[in-house]
Amino acid sequence: MHYPNLPALIADSKRTLTKGPIALVMIEDDVEVDSTLSHLGTFDFGNIIAFCAPDRTLPQTSSEVLHRVDYDVTADNALPDIANALIKALPDMWFYYCYNAEYLYYPFCEHRNVREMLGFMQEERRDSIMSYIVDIYARDLTAHPNGVDHVTAHFDKSGYYALARKDAAGVELERQLDIS
């Protein structure tokens, strides 16, 4: 389905977005759009909504779960505006968001789809679960001019790290991390 704007999607949401969870993909440029959408397709999302400029070309697909919305994702507050509008329209739905060339990983994602992860969360009475969004940078930009390498990916130079989260008194909280 192709929507000309966010209000058109919202108006149709009760009919077309009844199956969750829903992945929101902000497509800023042409880098790894196909692989990002394919990656999300392996997790059994009920719907995948790609937000992108009207002149952007998306991969041809027969997928009934992929929707396109024409939207300027580079505008100030684009992501919060989109997310808040959809949360208001579908308050009981679980949403995940990412940008193109970002890849979702969560515990046991190699063998469990996102619905199974959410079932686990519900059984455990959890409101959230630790997951990672990973940029897979290329070491050799001559060989990979788009900056992405699926085979020998590297983290960026500043790195990513986790520090123990502390309470107001400075005491480390069990099993809680601040990821930077």
Regions found by a protein language model. Name each.
Residues 1-34, 38-41:
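N-proximal low-complexity "stem/linker" segments adjacent to membrane-targeting elements
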